[in-house]
Amino acid sequence: MYCSDYHTHSQLSPDSSAPLEQMAQAAVEAGLDELCVTDHCDLLTLQGEPVERYDWPPAVAQYQAAAAQFSSGLTLKLGLELGMGHLNPAAAQTIVGQPELDFVLGSVHNQSPEKGGVDFYYVPYPDSAACYAALDDYFASMAILAATPCYDVLAHIIYPLRYMEAPVSLEGYYDRIRAILRTAVENGRGMEVNTYRGRTVAEWKPILELYRDCGGEILTVGSDAHIPGGVGKGIREAMELIAGCSFRYVCTYDKRKPVFHKL
């Protein structure tokens, strides 16, 4: 089974201090075949201020140095996690036009600007009502993002749940999630199973079933690791879940094109 971790962060993300070489070494030690670094580029800051560009030269230089160091034993790819790209499609398209880029995750990390624009990490969730209000806003933004051309795979479509402690069910959102996934499928894009460093695997089963019903085939798996110790966490379990949901492949990417690996 070809094992890849397609959601990882390095010192070029504001919430990580790990050199890419350390993340790559951790991938080797975890027995992975392929690692994609997907550092953050969010078009809103954590507090909701707009951003219009990304500093590519340090990212390309770090990637090229690590790729040379790990030229045998590990395939290393250059990706990007582009957050809130739907808010500025022109800027998003410029950012993802980098020729060295292999892969783009499209994510929603923030509330909509109308709701304040802050990262869902900072939103208070005192009760279930607050959780559902946040989810309403989140899936509305995700629906807009899904229709844009600035990503290859939708990242962690259940993202806000990781911060919510009150009881929450996604069943009331299945129609919205199905519509989001159908939009991605119709545009030749895919979905990520994000293990949240091994903490969320089983939660993806109903989402995978919705994706399958939409005709989805492109799936990537990512740990969302921000430190070497998180690399590869939950990847094999996620692949087993994917196979159990009747999918035949997981994907990696090369210059924005999916490569299918049989499960």
Predicted regions span which residues?
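Domain-core and long-helix interface of multi-subunit machines
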Residues: 14, 107-216
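An N-terminally biased module of ancient metal coordination in phosphate/nucleic-acid-related enzymes
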Residues: 1-86, 95-96, 160-174, 179-180, ...
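Hydrophobic residues within beta-strands of alpha/beta enzymes
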Residues: 35-37, 104, 154, 191, ...
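Active-site gating/metal-coordination segments in enzymes
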Residues: 12, 68-116, 120-127
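C-terminal regulatory/interaction regions
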Residues: 245-248, 257-263
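Short amphipathic alpha-helices and their capping/turn segments at secondary-structure boundaries
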Residues: 20-33, 87-102, 134-150, 208-209
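Structural recognition of alpha->loop->beta junctions
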Residues: 97-103, 148-149, 207-223, 236-251
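Active-site core of metal-dependent hydrolases
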Residues: 188-198, 219-228, 235, 249, ...
